[in-house]
Amino acid sequence: MSFSGEMSNGKTDVTNGGFSSSPEDMSGAEEGKENSSGIEVEASDVSLSLTADETGTTQAESRDSCSETSGEDKDSDSMDDTGHYSINDENRGNDQSHSEDEEEEEEEDEEEEAVRHRKRAQRKRANRDQESSDEERALDDWLISEKTPLPPPQWRALSALRQRQMGSSTRFIYEACGARGFVQRFHLLHGLDGHSGCVNTLHFNQRGTCLASGSDDLKVVVWDWVRRKPVLEFESGHKSNVFQAKFLPNSGDSTLAMCARDGQVRVAELSATHCCKNTKRVAQHKGASHKLALEPDSPCTFLSAGEDAVVFTIDLRQDRPASRLVVTKEKESKVGLYTIYVNPANTYQFAVGGRDQFVRIYDQRKINENVNNGVLKKFCPHHLVTSEAKANITCLVYSHDGSELLASYNDEDIYLFNSSHSDGAEYIKRYKGHRNNATVKGVNFYGPRSEFVVSGSDCGHIFLWEKSSCQIVQFMDGDKGGVVNCLEPHPHLPVLATSGLDYDVKIWLPTAKEPTELDGLKEVIKKNKRERDEDSLHHTDLFDNHMLWFLMHHLRQRGQRRRRRDAGLGAGDAESDDSPSSSDSSDDDEDGPDRVQCIPS
């Protein structure tokens, strides 16, 4: 084999990248060159003497051998390189297998976590279902208890009529008014139409011949409720919703006290000729004033309460009638008030309720705001004392003899307290089934001895409970607009007047042929309970969730009235919007939400 062939093959191998240029290879080549030069010459001579065929064959073999050599070198080098890369490949393979194992472990962990999550969700769902089923079962049990037979009535109509005929009973009407049989036969007699807004207040005079009503339309109407005719109608002088209008006792029906959303307390002087002489402001709260409290026998003095937490005592005999009696506080914070009532058995004492869960009783002779903020004693259902949901009292009222105190809580139930119990005492009765959320809902006793509890509801129904058994004995559809707010019993007869979002007053008498069957009561109670539970999950503050509803309701009604008015007026009549009679409406537009019925400021 010639050296030149090796060199040429060496070039080829260098080009192909298979030639070894390490120092060991180079030194071996030089040593071979020095020791065998003769052999190479001899070999070259021999190669020159060969024939052309042999030369071609030899060249071919030489090429083959060189190619084999280069192939061996290439294989040797490639083996060296392969050995280097094979370690990396093994490492990469190990890394890959390790990462695959980790991925498998992660997938297994994720699957296990997903399984655990599904199990937790199933347990939670099962717990929720169990809780809802328990609540449903408890509600069904309560409804079943509501349908259990009531004890026999103490008053029976036939025997009472027979005794009256014989002259042996002088208390027939008194006992009949408190009879369950009459309450279960309540039926709508008629409506009194005369307002153009929601009716927020009702009050019978002492004799029961007249009924006063006040409305969002800022008017007060005095009705002959039997003949369905207004005896007197006048502007109240208030700038916003009239919340209460009451005849002062022993005044000959000549004095009517009023309060409203504008915070004013006003007095109207009525004449015997069925006209209003004038109205004057006697007190001014810094917030809305929802309720007045009359003293049973006084034609000159009464109390007012406002959302500014102030209670005024008003004496019409004074040049400056109003004087501040107390500011209601819990620790150092003022508590806005929605309701106030004087104890009929002890007129020095009065109770208030408002923007917290406590019924507070004060004694006008013992108010010292430095001692317990002047409070004589407080009542609250014990489960509401530490409740996260913010409870509010929308209305409270004393019983006929002052021994009991009834309080209605916002989005809660109605509770009865014994007013003679000590400070912090628990309630003695609880009345359930209605819904008190959308407005400042009223509550009242019915019957000459406060035998029943009556309340409106957001579902538009009127509920009457028997006080002693807490069972619902009457259930009536009382308002098409959806909310019943006011309930006023007649002072002497089995008559009930109610009002709400509708623009009329409804008169109820026991004229039904058969006692009520309470049809649909179960479904209504379940719906009220479900809505109350849903609202309690995102409860914020009193009526925040319902303010928008009432604003939209009011704006829709205002738009409908405006469209009807515009449709009936010509172009010339349209200019009458600037007349003095429309100045109140412009003020109302500025007030905006102030014309929303029965919503706190």
From Swiss-Prot:
One cellular component (GO) term of this entry: cytoplasm
Compositionally biased spans, kind Polar residues: 1-24, 46-60
Residue stretches of biased makeup (Basic residues): 116-126
Ranges: WD repeats: 194-233, 237-278, 284-324, 332-372, 388-427, 435-475, 479-519
Compositional bias per record (Acidic residues), positions renumbered to this chain: 100-113
SMART domains noted in UniProt: WD40 (SM00320)
Keyword tags: Coiled coil, Cytoplasm, Nucleus, Repeat, WD repeat
Name the UniProt record assigns to this protein: DDB1- and CUL4-associated factor 8
